[in-house]
C-alpha cells in the first residue's frame, strides 16, 4: 500500500511537467554553464517550468529501461527540485526502490505506473486530490489503523460545515448560546 502512493505522485508530477520539460532541459543546460549558486539555479529552473517544481532529467518513467532501473529511477527522482525531492524522502522512496529491485518487481511496477494518464487534462487537480485521499484512506484501513486518525471524508466535512453555517442566524446570536 505504501508503495502505490509515491509512485502515483511520481507519475502525476511527470505528467504535469510534460508540457514544459523541453524548456526546463534547455534552461538547465544554460544554467549549468553559468556557475551560479544552487539557489539561483533552482529559481531559474522554476521560472522555466512555470510551476513550483521541476525535473532536469532527460529520462522519464518510459525511458528508464530494465537494466539498471533502480539506479536510473533514483537518478530520475534526484533530478526533481529540492521541495519535490523532500517529499520522496519522506516517503522513504529509495528504500522502496531497493525492496522492489531486490524481488525483481521494480521494472514491472514502473511499467504499470507509466501507462496511467495522470495529466491535468485527464484528471483535474481536485480529482487528483480525491484520488490521493482515497489511497490514503484505503492504506490506513489496510494497516489496521483507524482511518479517522488520518482522513476525514469530504461528505463529513461538508455536513459539519453546513451545520456550522446554518441559516438559523438568530439562534446563534442569543446571549449564552455559544
What are these regions (language model features)?
Residues 170-178:
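Conserved class I S-adenosyl-L-methionine
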Residues 1-169:
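Non-catalytic, mostly N-terminal accessory regions of nucleic-acid modification and defense proteins
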